[in-house]
Amino acid sequence: MTTSPGTVESTTPVSGQLRTVLSAGERPARATAVSATLTHLWRAMMAFKHFPVQLIDIVLMPLIFLLMFTYLFGGAFADSTEEYLQFYLPGVTVQAVVMMTVYTGTSLNTDIHKGVFDRFRTLPFWQPATLAGSLLGDVLRYVVALATTVSLGLLLGFRADGGFLGVVGAMLVLIVFGFSVSWIFAALGVVASEPERVSGTSMIVLYPLLFMSNIFVMPETMPGWMQAIVDANPMSHAATASRELMHGTAGFWDVGLVLCVSAGLVAVFAPLTMRLYRNKNAH
């Protein structure tokens, strides 16, 4: 059965009518920088819902390190495992946060290779929101890792002489520190050729920094040349600030130094990452 030309003409709107239909009503306002950032923050948080397996790494890895070093090596590093726990728990919180920052680079690089990056570049919103929202979403990872690690430490016998405020203060300082470090791996995620390169390179950089710090043992037990590296390592200052806050002996110097280092990392790597992101070859 065929349709007559007259019927086609009567059901096909003319160009003027089509423009009227499409232009009816007000267009939505362009997203502000804040709303665009919050949207990408929500997108990052939804990753936990759709990929809950990542919670295994976030929760289990710090707990495994805490149990392993406390009960396998604690007696050798200190007079007893209980004494070593008082030293190591504030340090392992630094390790937990810093290890989570690698997810920033791998998730960003995955978006680039899946084409999500190209789609975002064509949309009319504040482009830095893509990075800022993702990095703010990673704060949830830090909170989960810190909360579970500290909770287990308290169950094992850790004494937080700084009280609740000291523990919360240490967690806030480490969240700021982790946020600043995540910009480094965000820059790496933009330039890396594949997600595996991001994680591989990150481990090569992170493990020497973590182990050549005062997270695991006192610097006095190390050779002189290594002590100089430990003293200059930002991980050491973060661990010291965490210990002082949790044990109620915090001074301005170490906490202020960690915050200054964090501000410096953001000041350097945030603009660099944005520049690399804008100039990224769409191919």
UniProtKB/Swiss-Prot annotation:
The chain's coiled-coil residues are none
- How the protein assembles, per its UniProt entry? The complex is composed of two ATP-binding proteins (DrrA) and two transmembrane proteins (DrrB).
Q: What is the topology of this protein in the membrane according to its UniProt annotation?
A: Multi-pass membrane protein
- What does the similarity note say? Belongs to the ABC-2 integral membrane protein family.
- Cytoplasmic compartment ranges equal 1-53, 107-119, 160-169, 219-241, 281-283
User: What does this protein do, in the record's words?
Assistant: Part of the ABC transporter complex DrrAB involved in daunorubicin and doxorubicin resistance. Probably responsible for the translocation of the substrate across the membrane.
Q: Name one GO biological process term.
A: response to antibiotic
Taxonomy, superkingdom: Bacteria
**What cystine linkages occur within this chain?**
none
Which part of the chain is the ABC transmembrane type-2 domain?
A: 53-280
GO cellular-component term (any): ATP-binding cassette (ABC) transporter complex
What protein is this chain from?
Daunorubicin/doxorubicin resistance ABC transporter permease protein DrrB
State which residue ranges cross the membrane. 54-72, 88-106, 120-138, 142-159, 170-188, 200-218, 242-260, 263-280
Q: Name one GO molecular function term.
A: ABC-type transporter activity
Signal peptide limits: none
Which controlled-vocabulary keywords does the entry list?
A: Antibiotic resistance, Cell membrane, Membrane, Transmembrane, Transmembrane helix, Transport
| Spans within the Extracellular topological domain | 73-87, 139-141, 189-199, 261-262
Main location (coarse class): membrane
Q: Where in the cell is it found?
A: Cell membrane
